[in-house]
Amino acid sequence: MTEHPTQAAELAATVHPLHENPLTTPSESVEQNSTATILLPLTAKELPSADGSWEWQDYAEVRARIAEVKAAHRATHPVSLFDVLDFDPADLPKQAAQLQFRAPGALPLVSILIPVFNNAKLTLECLASIQQHLPTDLDVEIIVADDASTDHTQALLAPVANIRYLRNEQNLGFLRNCNQAMAHVNGAFTVYLNNDVQVTAGWLEALLATFADFDKVGAVGPKFVYPSGHLQEAGATLAPDGLSTMVGFAENPNEPRFNYTRRVDYVSGACLLAPTALLKRIGGFSEEFLPCYCEDSDLCLTIRAEGFEVYYNPHATVIHHLSKTTAAAGNDFKMASIANNVSVLNRKWASTIEQHFDPRLICFYLPQFHPVPENDLWWGKGFTEWANVSKAQPNFVGHYQPRIPADLGYYDLRLLEVMQAQADLAQRYGIHGFCFYYYWFDGKRLLERPVEQLLQSDKPDIPFCLCWANENWTRRWDGLEQEVLIAQAHSDEDDLAVINDLIRFFKDGRYIKVDDRPLMLIYRPTLFPDFAKTAARWREACREQGVGEIYIAMVESFGLATANFHPSQFGCDAAVEFPPGGLVQPKPPTGEMLNPDFIGHSADYRDIAVSFASRPGPAYTRFKGVMPGWDNTARRQHAGGCFERSTPGAFQAWLEESIADTRQQHFGDERLVFINAWNEWAEGAYLEPDRRFGHTYLEAVSNALDASRLLKKN
């Protein structure tokens, strides 16, 4: 795509500079690229080229600033304490006598399985919390599996009515204790519940509701919090080496990003609900992980291998002391068990975990750089955006213009070999695929040749998807949409016409999918009369034509940039972050003015990188977005906007953080990061090599992917 009508004004107003139409206005282009009033030629103030040093210097600063902003956010959003039961050890017999549970039926809905070894105080507190928050309308059995405790556990639990107390004659260890107790489970669902856990209101109802609200649920876990009120984990992620990360560790559990139900790599066995039949079929916890640790990770991976999903449901909250039940075994035993079982998990599941460990990086792709009849008609035969790119001039000292392409030159996208070279370059550095802008105006296509010739050929073999840039083409970009060249005409009939055209692409083997659902982006859903109805028509048409379900993501452009509207309001599955929209912090240019007619604005790239990278996540699926830079003065010489201090180092720091956040927040095919853009040359937003930076921005992409495997976060 390209920049929008109010780009310069929005940059000034700190709103959301976005894109402008690639069918550039010639009169503006010629006038605004005139060098008549520029005081100094470019050669008077040369800018340094990449030398392997200075272009990376912003990396450490930007990473540090991101960490500082996130820490400051945590400090200004204190957590709330939870009401935690804390029995006086001298009162344990009295507390045990007060426990009363209803007798379960012969075939209860849920069996709560509590493995214990000593720690009678914790066990009674756990049972008391269950009694306090057990739904009266659910048939529940409670099983306490005592692994030969040597304290007063047996004596204290003996008088408790309507619990099933199982006692091992000798200590079997956590894993075998759980597996042996499973033979006594009668419930349709089983909850593994550690005795150092206390449940809260609504916990069991919420966990059970997951199976009604989502498809193919195999296991679900709650939000774990510490007694201090801090988040312990909101699900967990796994790395191919077997190590895990507790999502949201020590964060505020009330943050929106931790408060929507989502799929995860695994959930902790400290509180895990699953269908009993499934658990018995797979044999419970694998004895490969004796005596304990990593058995819950393995269980969840096994459940997923059976074709089911593992969910985190934050509407169920439990308080977990963490490791109190294993503390008596000693730290040396614990660390040795962890080290051994991490190695076992790695050998068993590394290839499975590897499949989705790295987020897929998708670059927006502008299909503009070739002659089209509309450009010939309006601006002169043979006009392409290279005309604007090549004659841009610096407006102030330090302003990087013009941008001169290196490896690929001023290419023509009518040549399939150009697209092949682009694909080779992208894949060499770790880019997964391209998201082509798709232009449709009531049945008329524009700039369609690159993606059409891609569809008609098996080359290049690169994944791709489409983003419908569904807005009017206008002659002047003042935000008023006057002098419309080609108008949009959204209607029921057009909805069906456009999806029928798109289905051709969805059926291509290279088309990017999310869980086997073709991914379609919509640039401005708010321009439709009711995009939720449009999305419903699209989904129905795709089902009727054999495509199946599709995955629709809305771009957070214009008013959506900071609104945090849930995608479901528009009938969408997810949202796509689209920098620099919404978080710009304009500043005066830092260098001496060269163009006295310049009325545009600048901003510091490092600021936008920090703002987006440290931005709190919403309570829905939002794909992170990054950009290598931004400068639209090639189109608006006197009134454009630009970012200074755009360097590969700063970009890498931003991308690294986005990759890390994506890995924690999303699962599987939803681990996507979008880059704006591959080839937006007239906006200064491109990864393709230029003469100043060479391949360094592409190297930053590769570095960020590598660093995400090397930098371990607690």
Task: Give the predicted meaning of each segment.
Residues 168-185:
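Glycine-rich, basic loop-to-helix element that forms the pyrophosphate-binding segment
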Residues 190:
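Short aromatic/hydrophobic "clamp" motif used to bind/position activated sugar donors
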Residues 1-108, 332, 337-357:
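Non-catalytic membrane-proximal stalk/linker segments that position and tether the catalytic domains
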Residues 197-238:
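Conserved donor NDP-sugar-binding/catalytic core segment of glycosyltransferases
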Residues 175, 183, 231, 237-277, ...:
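A recurrent flexible, glycine/aromatic-enriched loop bordering the glycosyltransferase active site
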Residues 128-139:
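Short, acidic, metal-binding catalytic loop of nucleotide-sugar glycosyltransferases
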Residues 146-155, 170:
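A conserved acidic beta->alpha catalytic loop
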Residues 205-207, 263-283, 288-317:
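A short, conserved alpha-helix in the catalytic core of glycosyltransferases
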